[in-house]
Swiss-Prot record:
Family indicated by similarity: Belongs to the NusB family.
Superkingdom: Bacteria
Summary of the function given for this chain in its UniProt record: Involved in transcription antitermination. Required for transcription of ribosomal RNA (rRNA) genes. Binds specifically to the boxA antiterminator sequence of the ribosomal RNA (rrn) operons.
InterPro entries found in the cross-reference section: NusB-like_sf, NusB_fam, NusB_RsmB_TIM44
GO MF: RNA binding
Xref: SUPFAM superfamilies: NusB-like
UniProt source species: Leifsonia xyli subsp. xyli (strain CTCB07)
GO BP field: DNA-templated transcription termination; transcription antitermination
Keywords, alphabetical: RNA-binding, Transcription, Transcription antitermination, Transcription regulation
HAMAP family attached to this UniProt entry: NusB
Protein name stated in the entry: Transcription antitermination protein NusB
Gene name, Swiss-Prot/TrEMBL: nusB
PANTHER family recorded: ANTITERMINATION NUSB DOMAIN-CONTAINING PROTEIN, N UTILIZATION SUBSTANCE PROTEIN B-RELATED
GO cellular component, one term: cytosol
Amino acid sequence: MSARTKARKRALDLLFSADVRQISLAHALAVEAERAANEPAREASWLYAREIVDGVIDNQEEIDEQIETYAQGWTLARMPAVDRAILRIGVWELLFNDQVPDGVAISEAVEAATVLSTDDSAGFVNGLLAKIAQNKPRDGEVDR
C-alpha cells in the first residue's frame, strides 16, 4: 500500500470518526496530530492525511455542494457516514489537489468504498466522482 493510500485511509478514519462522534474536524485533527507526534514511522502518511483533512475543512461548503449537486436523489444526511467521508476526500482531490490525477482520485475512492461500505457504494462513488471530474473547470476555463 502506497504512502498516499495510507494517508487517504488515515484521513478517511478522521473524517468518519468526527462525523459519527459529532465532533469538529479541527478537534479530531488536533487529537491525531498529538498521536502522530509519537509515531515518526507514520510521518509520511500523516503529512498527506493532514493536507487532505485541512483541505476538506477549508473547502467543505463547496465540496458538500458538489456532492449534493451530483448525488441525484440523495442528500448528504441520507448517505452512510463512510460514503460521505470517501466522497469528501475524492472531491477535494479532484477539485483542489492538482498533484493527483482525476483517475487516481476516483480509483482510490472506489477502492475504499468497495472495502469499507455497502455493495452499491462503489458504483455510486464512481458515478458521482466521474460526473464531478467531467464537469470541473479546466485550466483557463471560467467556473460554470
